[in-house]
């Protein structure tokens, strides 16, 4: 891969994963008749002027099962009968030959084999501390990452410097796979278009939403949807993101969580766990998934809306960095129960016998600290 394959943002936009998180212009507007939030260009800071937040507080927070009408089923069948369009050429191709899904390991191998040296030079693997902060970190901070794991850590941070290149076939397959696994579509879609807004990107081009996390944000989404253990969780969080009152931009929220993972890695919050497992990438992936699970749980149970997003994300970052091991343990327990049909973020509890503990018994780190609160300074800007 040459430098054109990975677009590197300026220091102001992306300084070792600390840059401006997301662009403005992805905010909800309100349909009074249907009580639906649609993200169509109203700045979040302006929501209070449109009566949206007041209206949200008056709605009943009930989960209503949606009945799929025959018209919807027919439309879906007609859509699936349409020939797919290849993103590289824009020409029609046989619907019997859709693009092949790509696994996380295959996508990772792509970055392990191409030349990323121009981007690796620009990373700052750890936070630089001086004075009392350095002394305090030395005496009371987490352990240093083992020397043999630092190359793997640097690869993670280097991928976070790379942007999305729509001309790179691997990049395109990653996007296609994420879209298909979340929507259930069997066919390819254009790499630019309004359909990406349905997944929670800001606009028609997903590349514009990766600042602060780079291509690592897409690799994390790929991991979430291609791992058979985390796919049900990803689908549940995606459904939560489309709730008629509590909806939020799924992919933008995921980018923010990847940014938290980058910061936790650079601040050595994950070093102890990486040293214990003798690997970095799986730990970072699990930390990302565990943090996303915690956010979804708080969002669902505390009835958060988009106006709470800034506060929730700031508190989430503090909690995730403080107690990564507890988050990872919660994820492990949750996935084990989901595999047995005993836990669900959205649906009713399923217990098959007295030995099956309810999902509410899982300990979510710092849950009591996240009280209902609205914040004007949101991260989705």
UniProtKB/Swiss-Prot annotation:
Disulfide bonds listed in the record: none
Name used for this protein in its record: ELMO domain-containing protein 3
Mutagenesis / variant outcome for changing residue 171 to R: In DFNA81; uncertain significance; perturbed subcellular location with loss of colocalization with F-actin in the cytoplasm and concentration in the nucleus; may also have a shorter half-life than the wild-type protein
ELMO domain location: 170-324
Positions with biased composition (Basic and acidic residues): 9-19
Coiled coil: none
UniProt-reported outcome of changing residue 265 to S: In DFNB88; uncertain significance; perturbed subcellular location with loss of targeting to stereocilia and concentration in the nucleus; loss of ARL2 GAP activity
UniProt-annotated stretches for the region Disordered: 1-31
Provenance organism: Homo sapiens (Human)
Pfam families associated with the record: ELMO_CED12
Domain of life: Eukaryota
Role: Acts as a GTPase-activating protein (GAP) for ARL2 with low specific activity.
InterPro entries: ELMO_dom (IPR006816), ELMO_domain-containing (IPR050868)
Record's subcellular location: Cell projection, Stereocilium; Cell projection, Kinocilium; Cytoplasm, Cytoskeleton
Tissue specificity remark: Both isoform 1 and isoform 6 are widely expressed.
Any one of the GO BP annotations: cytoskeleton organization
CC annotations in GO: cytoskeleton; Golgi apparatus; kinocilium; stereocilium
Coarse class of the protein's main subcellular location: other
Disorder association: Deafness, autosomal recessive, 88: A form of non-syndromic deafness characterized by prelingual onset of severe to profound mixed conductive and sensorineural hearing loss.
Alphabetic keyword roster: Cell projection, Cilium, Cytoplasm, Cytoskeleton, Deafness, GTPase activation, Non-syndromic deafness
Source taxonomy: Eukaryota, Metazoa, Chordata, Craniata, Vertebrata
């Amino acid at each position: 891969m040459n430098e054109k394959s990975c677009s590197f943002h300026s220091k102001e936009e992306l300084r070792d994963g600390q840059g401006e998180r997301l662009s403005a212009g992805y905010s909800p507007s309100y349909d009074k008749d249907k009580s639906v939030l649609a993200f169509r260009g109203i700045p979040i800071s302006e929501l209070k002027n449109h009566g949206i937040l007041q209206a949200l507080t008056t709605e009943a927070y009930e989960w209503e099962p949606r009945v799929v009408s025959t018209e919807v089923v027919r439309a879906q069948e007609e859509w699936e009968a349409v020939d797919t369009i290849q993103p590289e050429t824009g020409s029609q191709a046989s619907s019997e030959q859709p693009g092949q899904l790509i696994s996380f390991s295959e996508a990772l191998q792509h970055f392990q084999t191409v030349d990323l040296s121009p981007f690796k030079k620009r990373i700052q693997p750890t936070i630089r501390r001086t004075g009392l902060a350095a002394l305090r970190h030395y005496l009371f901070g987490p352990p240093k990452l083992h020397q043999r794991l630092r190359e793997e850590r640097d690869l993670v941070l280097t991928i976070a410097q790379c942007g999305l290149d729509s001309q790179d076939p691997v990049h395109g397959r990653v996007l296609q796979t994420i879209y298909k696994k979340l929507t259930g579509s069997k066919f390819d879609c254009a790499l630019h278009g309004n359909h990406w807004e349905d997944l929670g990107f800001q606009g028609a081009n997903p590349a514009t939403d990766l600042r602060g996390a780079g291509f690592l944000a897409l690799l994390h989404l790929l991991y979430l949807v291609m791992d058979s253990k985390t796919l049900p969780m990803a689908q549940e969080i995606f459904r939560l993101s489309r709730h008629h009152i509590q909806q939020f931009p799924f992919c933008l929220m995921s980018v923010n969580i990847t940014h938290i993972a980058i910061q936790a890695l650079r601040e050595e919050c994950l070093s102890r766990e990486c040293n214990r497992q003798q690997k970095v990438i799986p730990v970072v992936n699990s930390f990302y998934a565990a943090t996303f699970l915690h956010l979804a749980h708080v969002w669902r149970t505390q009835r958060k809306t988009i106006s709470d997003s800034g506060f929730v994300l700031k508190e989430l970052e503090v909690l995730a960095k403080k107690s990564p091991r507890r988050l990872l343990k919660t994820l492990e327990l949750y996935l084990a129960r989901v595999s047995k049909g005993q836990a669900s973020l959205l649906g009713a509890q399923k217990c098959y016998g007295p030995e099956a503990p309810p999902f509410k018994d899982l300990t979510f780190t710092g849950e009591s600290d996240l009280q209902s609160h609205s914040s004007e300074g949101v991260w989705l800007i």
